Curated annotation (Swiss-Prot):
GO terms for biological process: L-histidine biosynthetic process; methionine biosynthetic process; purine nucleotide biosynthetic process; tetrahydrofolate interconversion. NADP(+) binds at G166, R167, S168, S195, I236. Belongs to the tetrahydrofolate dehydrogenase/cyclohydrolase family. Keywords: Amino-acid biosynthesis, Histidine biosynthesis, Hydrolase, Methionine biosynthesis, Multifunctional enzyme, NADP, One-carbon metabolism, Oxidoreductase, Purine biosynthesis. Homodimer. The gene is folD. One of its GO terms (cellular component) is cytosol. The keyword Repeat does not apply. One of its GO terms (molecular function) is methylenetetrahydrofolate dehydrogenase (NADP+) activity. It catalyses: (6R)-5,10-methylene-5,6,7,8-tetrahydrofolate + NADP(+) = (6R)-5,10-methenyltetrahydrofolate + NADPH; (6R)-5,10-methenyltetrahydrofolate + H2O = (6R)-10-formyltetrahydrofolate + H(+). This is Bifunctional protein FolD. Pfam families: THF_DHG_CYH, THF_DHG_CYH_C. Catalyzes the oxidation of 5,10-methylenetetrahydrofolate to 5,10-methenyltetrahydrofolate and then the hydrolysis of 5,10-methenyltetrahydrofolate to 10-formyltetrahydrofolate. The lineage of its organism: Bacteria, Pseudomonadati, Chlorobiota, Chlorobiia, Chlorobiales.
Length: 294
């Protein structure tokens, strides 16, 4: 059984990107720039934003975090995004979600220029993904990271049955649209399960590749997994743990111990898909930078 080490892979990707950033810095005195906007003081969002800025700094990318109060109006936020759209030193724009209730998240997504939408949420990028123009769009970072895991571990996907549990716009839907593409490390027969699917285990037991992204701790048990399946666990859930300093620990949507007995390969939580998501955000920012150079 192979543990698919996303932490190690993400370090490799960062090292590759760092080399590229240094080359551009020497040759043209320019580096990619990512700007992250955070509205309000959600503690989890603040941690994510800090991690993104730290990762940019590690590889020499320019990064800026714009912190706005929770009282910021939608109009003010859209004006800030418009300014960044026109700033030639900004190649990636990301607005950290969730946003305060009075701000329409879809209006914010639409406001970001598609060519700077490194999160891959703009309808133009989603449409290009569905049509298979992956070279001409930004792919949502978590699904992009999963493809990169499959690729770097050389996991055969062609003709395999891929079952995705979850249908979010961030993971489930883009993942399904990727896995049906006639491309290497995709090209699967795809089934999507969700909250209205009766007896999810019927489907998960048929999966050659099982991707769990529902946000329910250890929802996928060992008896729901086919022997020899590749299991990708996207979930990050806090559960109580009296023996830790914080009083909790992180687990995925899959019961790792039980699944390990059945799977041929599995991503751990933490250290699997999570670190890859941030590395792919950096990769998308580099792609945007190179697009603007061209």
């Amino acid at each position: 059984m192979v543990v698919l080490d996303g932490k190690k892979l993400s370090q490799e990707i960062k090292a590759e990107l760092k080399t590229k950033v240094e080359q551009y810095k020497q040759e043209i005195q320019k580096v990619p720039g990512l700007t992250v906007i955070i509205v309000g003081e959600d503690p989890a969002s603040q941690v994510y934003v800090r991690n993104k800025a730290k990762s940019c700094n590690e590889i020499g990318m320019a990064s800026e975090v714009i912190e706005l109060p929770a009282s910021t109006s939608q109009e003010e936020l859209l004006k800030k995004i418009a300014d960044l759209n026109h700033n030639p030193n900004v190649h990636g724009i990301l607005v950290q979600q969730p946003l305060p209730k009075h701000i329409d998240e879809f209006a914010v997504t639409l406001a970001i220029a598609p060519e700077k939408d490194v999160d891959g949420f703009h309808p133009e990028n989603v449409g290009r993904l569905v049509l298979g123009h992956l070279d001409k769009c930004f792919v949502s970072c978590t699904p992009f990271g999963i493809i990169e895991i499959l690729k770097r571990y050389n996991i055969e996907t062609k003709g395999k049955h891929c079952v995705i549990v979850g249908r979010s716009n961030i993971v489930g839907k883009p993942m399904a649209n990727l896995m049906v593409q006639k491309l290497a490390y995709m090209n699967c027969t795809v089934t999507v399960c969700h909250s209205a699917t009766p007896d999810i285990a019927t489907y998960t037991k048929q999966a050659d590749i099982l991707i769990a992204a529902i946000g329910k701790a250890r929802f996928i048990t060992g008896d729901m997994i086919k022997a020899g399946a590749v299991v990708i666990d996207v979930g990050i859930n806090r559960i109580e743990a009296t023996n830790t300093k914080s009083g909790y620990r992180l687990v995925g949507d899959v019961d790792f111990e039980a699944a390990s007995q059945k799977a041929s390969a599995i991503t751990p939580v933490p250290g699997g898909v999570g670190p890859m998501t941030i590395s792919m955000l950096l990769a998308n920012t580099m792609k945007s930078f190179e697009h603007f150079l061209a």
